[in-house]
A protein has these predicted regions:
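Phosphate- and other anionic-substrate recognition elements at nucleic-acid/protein interfaces
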Residues: 1-186
Length: 186
C-alpha cells in the first residue's frame, strides 16, 4: 500500500490490438514503478470480444492496484479512420471502467506528454523513452513501446495535472496540462 502522501497513477496508451498500461507512485519528487505491461487482443477475434478483454483487464488492474487517477492519451485523427474508430472504442472500454471505479481521468495529447517528459513538445519517441527510463530509475527502456508510452502518460499527469490536495491544477489546463472529466453520475 502506498504512503499517505503518495499519488498512484495509471497511464493508458489505448489501442484495440495493444493497450499499454503503466502504474506509478509519486511521493514528493520521487517516482516508483508499480507495474506496467500491455493488454493484447487477438486479431481474428470478434471486435466486441476484443473490447471486452480490454475492459476486463482494466477492471482487474483498477481493482488490484487502486490508482487515484488515470492519464490517457487523447484521441487524435490520423489518416487511417478505421484505426481511429477502433482506438476510440478501446478508449471507451477503458473509460467505462474508470468511471465505474470513480477514478478521475485526465487526457493528454502526445505533444503535451513530450513536453512534460522532455521539455520539448516535438521530441522523438526515443527521447521520451530515455527520459521515462531516467525519471523512473529503470535499468532498461520499458518494453514494449505501448507500455513505455503509458508510463510516460502517468509521469505527465504526476508532473503537471494534479496537486497533492488531489485537485485539478487551476488555470489554463487544456492547452498545457490536459483536463479532467468529473463523474456526473454520482
Amino acid at each position: 500500500m502506498p504512503e499517505k502522501n503518495t499519488q498512484r497513477i495509471i497511464g493508458i496508451d489505448p489501442g484495440y490490438a495493444i493497450t499499454g498500461y503503466g502504474i506509478i507512485d509519486k511521493c514528493g519528487n520521487k517516482f516508483s514503478v508499480v507495474d506496467y505491461g500491455v493488454i493484447e487482443t487477438k486479431p481474428k477475434t470478434d471486435f466486441p470480444v476484443r473490447l471486452l478483454a480490454i475492459n476486463e483487464k482494466i477492471k482487474f488492474l483498477l481493482d488490484q492496484f487502486k490508482p487515484d487517477y488515470m492519464s490517457i492519451e487523447e484521441l487524435f485523427m490520423g489518416k487511417n479512420h478505421t484505426t481511429v474508430i477502433g482506438t476510440a472504442q478501446a478508449r471507451g472500454a477503458v473509460l467505462v471502467e474508470a468511471a465505474r471505479a470513480g477514478i478521475e481521468v485526465f487526457e493528454f495529447t502526445p505533444g503535451q506528454v513530450k513536453l512534460a517528459i522532455t521539455g520539448y513538445g516535438v521530441a522523438e519517441k526515443k527521447q521520451v523513452q530515455l527520459m521515462t527510463k531516467s525519471i523512473l530509475g529503470l535499468k532498461e527502456i520499458p518494453k514494449p513501446d505501448d507500455a513505455a508510452d503509458a508510463l510516460a502518460l502517468a509521469i505527465c499527469l504526476a508532473n503537471t495535472g494534479v496537486n497533492f490536495a488531489g485537485k485539478a491544477v487551476s488555470g489554463y489546463q487544456y492547452g498545457r496540462y490536459g483536463y479532467s472529466r468529473r463523474n456526473e453520475f454520482g
